[in-house]
Amino acid sequence: MRCRRVVAAFAACILGAASGDLAVSRVATGASSQPILMAAPYEYLGWGNPQPPAGVLAATGIQDLTLAFVLSHGACSPAWDGTRPLTGGPDQAAIESVRAAGGNVAVSFGGSSGNKLGVSCKSASALANAYQKVISAYGLEAIDIDIEHTEFTSAAVRRRVVAALAIVQRSNPGIEISITFATAESGPEHDGQSLIADAAAIGLQPSAWTVMPFDFGAPVSDMAQASISAVEELEHDLLSSYHISADVAYRHIGISSMNGHTDESDETVSIEDFQLMLAFAQQDHLARLTFWSVDRDRPCGGANRSPDACSGTSQQPFAYTDLVAEYHG
């Protein structure tokens, strides 16, 4: 039986567990090590005034970060932002600094702008090789595919991406994979539903299907409830495509929010909204709770006045990151 969640009454709903076809990740197995993707907010080093990654760990309880974005440097060649080399630059230094501080990183491919590898690489095997170059460069244990624009809206490119990820999953046993994509308040729309169905059809089993419940394009009065509603509808899609239980489905779902003011002038994800998302994630043991981005996790002022460098809300530094640090599945 599926219960409808109400933000004000989390404890009223209890889901029963059942076996399913989707492989249960470390989130559900009780392994002692927390998956990297579970609580790893995004940081982007390409603009603004980014917070030093190791400094984020030192200032908060967070252990892991998701560094963004790897794009195409032309043809099918991966590079940070499509321009910076994989090795010998600031991005490799950032990864090394996080690991030296006792943490780890996931690397995110794609994002909202730039040339995407899924489009530039003309076959699934070539795209898998591009992903593998990045995995091998850093010995990665976790990757995120932030699939947007043509990668998301073109059926042929979507299928190429999931086929490439299936190759990566076979070649790297145990690797964590998140597929992150846009959603409506009513849940994934046609492209998102097709993405899930295509992945299930070829046996791809991501650690997390992560929705981005913001930039809805219409006024939303309650961003926490809108986010929860989107997740509940995503659960339906996973049940339909993978034929699994509700419990297993939730353990393979993620929320990637946006802290403070979003790209929409009438949207704000407040600290209180994010606290409710945290409570929901804890209730249903979601695979992932994250946000865009650590760069913005501070009040505006001084050198940090652009929307890329601050949240636009009244907050303490790292207020959203501190909440993610509380999440342990």
Regions found by a protein language model. Name each.
Residues 270-287:
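Short, low-complexity, polybasic intrinsically disordered segments
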Residues 1-28:
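Secretory targeting and sorting signals
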Residues 32-211, 215-244, 248-274, 300-327:
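Chitinase-like catalytic core of GlcNAc-active glycosidases
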Residues 254-257, 288-293:
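Conserved active-site loop/cleft motifs that coordinate metal ions or position small ligands
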Residues 23, 83, 291, 297-299:
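Intrinsic disorder/low-complexity detector
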Residues 15-19, 48, 288:
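Hydrophobic alpha-helical elements and their junctions with loops/disorder across both membrane
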Residues 249, 282-284, 293-294:
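C-terminal "post-core" interaction segments
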